[in-house]
Amino acid sequence: QHREGYDFARLVAQSPELEAFTVSNPVGQTTIDFQDVGAVRMLNQALLKDYYNINFWDIPTNCLCPPIPGRVDYIHYLADLLACSNDQKIPRGRNIKALDIGTGASVVYPLVGQSEYGWHFTGVDIDPAALKSAQQICQFNKLKINLRRQNIRENIFRGVIEPHDTFHITLCNPPFHASME
């Protein structure tokens, strides 16, 4: 959806607060300063609101602010992968169960996957503050996303997957660290 850039007029119409972060690039096109974390957050909020019907998305300032288009692409790749074993038809609906390891405060994969395809998500994280933020986003938007805490960092699946659980897909980002060390 965003390969040709962003429709800032449309996004500002939906989220007027984004306008304060818009600038003109050297060729006169409207954009934002992608080095400005506040601008990226506001763009993410506008994209989620306009394209995915997520009316509240606010994460703590010390948390990763994921670029929405890349996360959307990942969900579409997974949909294409699921279609390979479903007569080339992308499966939709809550009968498709997805497990997001490291869902984070932004809970972005479950938000987009549920909005685009109606899939049922379970998000897992080790950080209680991230899960609290994710829970607030889910509650405010009236979304049924199951959130679970992984208490032992070394265990990725053990302790969060219950004996009755079945998942069609598991997704994650690489681990994020506070520094390069």
Q: Where would I find each of the regions flagged by the language model?
A:
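Conserved SAM-binding loop of SAM-dependent methyltransferases across substrates and taxa
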Residues: 105-119
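Conserved alpha-helix/loop element of class I SAM-dependent methyltransferases that forms part
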Residues: 46-51, 69-97
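N-terminal auxiliary segments of SAM/dcSAM-dependent transferases
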Residues: 1-65, 80
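Short, well-ordered alpha-helices that flank and scaffold nucleotide-derived cofactor binding pockets
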Residues: 80, 111, 115, 136-140
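Conserved SAM-binding motif I beta-strand of class I
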Residues: 120-126
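Gly/Ser/Thr-rich loops at beta-strand to alpha-helix junctions
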Residues: 64, 69-70, 103-107
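Conserved class I S-adenosyl-L-methionine
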Residues: 91-104, 122
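S-adenosylmethionine
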Residues: 126-128, 132-181
